[in-house]
Amino acid sequence: MSHNSQAFLSTNAGLPPSYETIKEEYGVTELGEPSNSAVVRTTVINMPREVSVPDHVVWSLFNTLFFNACCLGFVAYAYSVKSRDRKMVGDVVGAQAYASTAKCLNISSLIFSILMVIICIIIFSTTSVVVFQSFAQRTPHSGF
């Protein structure tokens, strides 16, 4: 029999060969501590992660196109673009300052616009009720 067939034809049918048999067969030796152990040194470098500054350009553009109360949306858009420019240059503090101003202007524009929409709805609904009542009183009802 060849060396390859001995692994398949063992006396322990159905049982895996023992560790000693494999160790002797393949010449595995147990390794201990390395004879000349070198000191392992580690170096930790703290890399500052890139600070993400939201510039609110999309929100400002939305307010400019749809809720431009007192031109606050347009001014917020200008500050958002300035914030993005400062971020591209690398001035994080300036970008945060412009972004904060743009955020405040966007909030103000949104609040003013929502209030204007609510006031317009109230005026339209009360006016339509008054007009409907005045037409109902003036027109006589026919018996048909």
UniProtKB/Swiss-Prot annotation:
Tissue specificity remark: Predominantly expressed in nascent primordial germ cells, as well as in gonadal germ cells.
Top-level lineage group: Eukaryota
Disulphide linkage map: none
Residue(s) carrying Phosphotyrosine: Y19
Chief location bin: membrane
Keywords: Acetylation, Antiviral defense, Cell membrane, Endosome, Immunity, Innate immunity, Lipoprotein, Lysosome, Membrane, Palmitate, Phosphoprotein, Transmembrane, Transmembrane helix
Modified how: Palmitoylation on membrane-proximal cysteines controls clustering in membrane compartments and antiviral activity. Phosphorylation at Tyr-19 is required for endosomal and lysosomal location.
Cytoplasmic compartment spans: 1-56, 78-110
Swiss-Prot/TrEMBL GO biological process terms: cellular response to interferon-beta; defense response to virus; host-mediated suppression of symbiont invasion; response to virus
GO cellular component annotations of the record: late endosome membrane; lysosomal membrane; plasma membrane; protein-containing complex
Compartments, record wording: Cell membrane; Lysosome membrane; Late endosome membrane
Residue(s) carrying N-acetylmethionine: M1
Protein family membership: Belongs to the CD225/Dispanin family.
SUBUNIT field: Interacts with CD81.
Function: IFN-induced antiviral protein which inhibits the entry of viruses to the host cell cytoplasm, permitting endocytosis, but preventing subsequent viral fusion and release of viral contents into the cytosol. Active against multiple viruses, including influenza A virus, SARS coronavirus (SARS-CoV), Marburg virus (MARV) and Ebola virus (EBOV), Dengue virus (DNV) and West Nile virus (WNV). Can inhibit: influenza virus hemagglutinin protein-mediated viral entry, MARV and EBOV GP1,2-mediated viral entry and SARS-CoV S protein-mediated viral entry.
Protein name, as recorded: Interferon-induced transmembrane protein 2
Species name: Mus musculus
